[in-house]
């Protein structure tokens, strides 16, 4: 190391300077300084500092629905009744699995996860009883999903366990809908690959979900961090899986749908707020998610912080935050792309990042990314996220051999440049030692 600094590309959260302290203080004061608010006694809203309703404040859900409609422009509009509030995306995934699957009982047969996958998602599925029941689904070379493989595996599992009618549990009021399969994915600016799935892929995936009674859980947490659109306007996001599902749903045959958008404000405001939301096709599924035992006991898990978020949205402050973040991350992503091309081996496989936090970098044949990452951290003070972190439990595909995930959320441009220079230097040492082309 030339100096004592550590450059950490593993971190997937904003730089401290990007955390909107002043905006949050301003919104909190606007929310709490009045002694009374018109909705304080409304059971669908409640005072910000008391227990909230199970689904979360109505006015906040209405503000989020407006934001969704402005950014996604769905064919069939999102309404407040389609949304419930959560304690963030991690809580949201846990709650979805708890409320819609029965892995322990064997009814929900299999969980499918896109691979490479978010590196902390495995434990949540293991906690929900999916140990030994998790299948990796690759992305294709063009950044889409291997839907043929997914369809083949669904057909195999259905042949092993003949299909039954969709299960609802009549003892609960309202009845609880349970799915035979579940799939986890990040369709837009995926973590870790950075891929965005086309509308055709999304449509075909919803069709498969309906055919095999599979719930699609999409982490829609990066959708609004687009770099390839003017940053002075709200981003125009691709239709989410929920919007594709809703646009073609026959409610006489299915009033639940097969999709849940699991979203968070951690990436576009601040992770410490621990606040997110979920959206489903109709009000039935989010109603089920909101009426688990914990919410019935304590109300929405982010009553105060969700109202701070609602204030940020309704005052227009969130739009300004998005504008700033997208500009900052775009600049960093451009520096990263140039540095990859300048410092890494010529045959490195890397696609320029056009949104979100992450991108995926694969070194040429013969390079060992795991060994390179160890040397980088120990001798050069650079921390990279080696591909081995992004495997699906019990269905590994070998991402640790040559691939790493890179992040622009935490490091400043000069740190990105220097980190990639050191990365390239170690790759050069590696190539020289093994007689590899550089």
Regions found by a protein language model. Name each.
Residues 1-70, 382, 398-401:
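N-terminal "arm"/small-domain region of PLP-dependent enzymes with the aminotransferase-like
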Residues 33-213, 217, 223-250, 260, ...:
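Conserved core of the PLP fold type I
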Residues 12-16, 90-91, 117-119, 188-191, ...:
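Short, solvent-exposed loop/turn segments at secondary-structure junctions
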Residues 63, 124-127, 133, 173, ...:
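Conserved core segment of the aminotransferase class I/II
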Residues 58, 66, 254-255, 378-379, ...:
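PLP-dependent enzyme catalytic core of the Aspartate aminotransferase-like
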Residues 285-290, 298, 358-405, 413-418:
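Conserved C-terminal alpha-helix-loop-beta "cap" of PLP-dependent enzymes
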């Amino acid at each position: 190391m030339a100096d004592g600094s550590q450059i950490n590309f593993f971190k997937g959260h904003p730089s401290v300077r990007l955390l909107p302290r002043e905006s949050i203080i301003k919104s909190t004061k606007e929310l709490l300084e009045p002694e009374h608010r018109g909705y304080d006694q409304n059971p669908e809203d409640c005072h910000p500092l008391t227990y909230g309703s199970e689904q979360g404040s109505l006015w906040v859900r209405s503000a989020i629905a407006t934001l969704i409609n402005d950014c996604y422009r769905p064919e069939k509009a999102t309404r407040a009744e389609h949304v419930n509030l959560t304690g963030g995306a991690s809580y949201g995934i846990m709650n979805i699995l708890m409320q819609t699957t029965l892995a322990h009982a064997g009814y929900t047969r299999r969980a499918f996860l896109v691979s490479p996958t978010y590196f902390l998602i495995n434990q949540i599925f293991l906690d929900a009883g999916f140990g030994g029941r998790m299948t990796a689904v690759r992305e294709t070379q063009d950044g889409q999903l291997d839907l043929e493989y997914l369809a083949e595996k669904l057909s195999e599992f259905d042949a092993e366990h003949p299909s039954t009618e969709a299960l609802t549990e009549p003892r609960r009021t309202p009845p609880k809908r349970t799915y035979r399969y579940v799939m986890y994915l990040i369709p837009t600016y995926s973590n870790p690959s950075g891929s965005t799935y086309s509308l055709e892929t999304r449509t075909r995936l919803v069709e498969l979900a309906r055919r095999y009674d599979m719930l699609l859980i999409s982490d829609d947490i990066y959708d609004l961090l687009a770099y390839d659109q003017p940053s002075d306007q709200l981003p125009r996001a691709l239709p989410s899986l929920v919007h594709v599902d809703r646009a073609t749903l026959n409610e006489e045959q299915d009033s639940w749908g097969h999709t849940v958008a699991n979203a968070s404000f951690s990436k576009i405001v601040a992770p410490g707020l621990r606040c997110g939301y979920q959206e489903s096709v109709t009000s039935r599924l989010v109603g089920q998610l909101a009426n688990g035992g914990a919410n019935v006991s304590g109300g929405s898990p982010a009553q105060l912080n969700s109202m701070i978020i609602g204030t940020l949205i309704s005052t227009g402050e969130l739009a300004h935050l998005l504008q700033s973040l997208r500009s900052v991350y775009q600049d960093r992503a451009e520096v990263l792309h140039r540095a990859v091309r300048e410092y890494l081996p010529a045959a490195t496989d890397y696609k320029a990042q056009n949104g979100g936090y992450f991108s995926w970098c694969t070194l040429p044949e013969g390079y060992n990314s795991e060994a390179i990452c160890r040397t980088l951290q120990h001798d050069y003070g650079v921390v990279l996220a080696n591909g081995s972190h992004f495997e699906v439990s019990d269905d590994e595909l070998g991402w640790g051999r040559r691939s790493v995930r890179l992040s622009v959320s935490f490091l400043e441009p000069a740190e990105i440049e220097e980190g990639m220079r050191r990365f390239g230097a170690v790759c050069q040492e590696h190539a020289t030692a093994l007689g590899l082309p550089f």
